[in-house]
């Protein structure tokens, strides 16, 4: 498929919420793709409320699969972290996230939550996101604060799923 599309596999990142068997299967494939894990919380209690699949594949299993992927592929891992005010933008979460990112040698991408009619949470403030990024950086974690794009047309990360649901599509 990659050859047909004219895209180098090295330019492709596969993103997952943490389906452990899928990560392990991808590690066995010959393609040198990068892996991004949508983590959003650094402990099982909070992550299970934000990412329900965590109840099936808890952090210890997810981290083991991600480490296996890194060791087999030698491709950079990314951790995706949607910043939610008062939910996962605390110093406690930053410390826990830094420990996970360090063990996995992962790069962390922070992005403000995009509002949808289905979300109760609100985005962290720009100053809180920057402070969280500083906390990670001070612990030796490579971190990027991502720009939110497409929010004005309901096409940003997380918003398309809601739009697809309104149209009867599955995401």
Predicted regions and their residues:
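Conserved AdoMet/S-adenosylmethionine-binding subsite of the radical SAM
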Residues: 1-139, 143
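Radical SAM enzyme core and accessory elements
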Residues: 138, 148-171
């Amino acid at each position: 498929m990659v050859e047909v599309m004219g895209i180098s596999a090295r330019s492709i990142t596969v993103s997952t919420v943490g389906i452990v068997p899928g990560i392990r299967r991808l590690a066995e494939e010959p393609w040198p793709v990068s892996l991004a894990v949508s983590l959003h919380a650094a402990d099982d209690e909070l992550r299970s409320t934000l990412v329900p699949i965590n109840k099936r594949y808890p952090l210890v299993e997810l981290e083991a699969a991600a480490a296996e992927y890194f060791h087999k592929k030698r491709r950079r891992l990314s951790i995706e972290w949607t910043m939610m005010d008062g939910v996962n933008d605390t110093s406690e979460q930053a410390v826990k996230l830094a420990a996970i990112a360090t063990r996995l040698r992962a790069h962390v991408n922070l992005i403000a939550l995009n509002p949808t009619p289905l979300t109760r949470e609100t985005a962290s403030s720009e100053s809180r996101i920057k402070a969280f990024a500083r906390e990670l950086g001070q612990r030796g974690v490579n971190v990027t604060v991502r720009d939110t794009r497409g929010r004005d047309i309901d096409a940003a990360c997380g918003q398309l799923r809601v739009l697809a649901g309104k149209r009867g599509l599955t995401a």
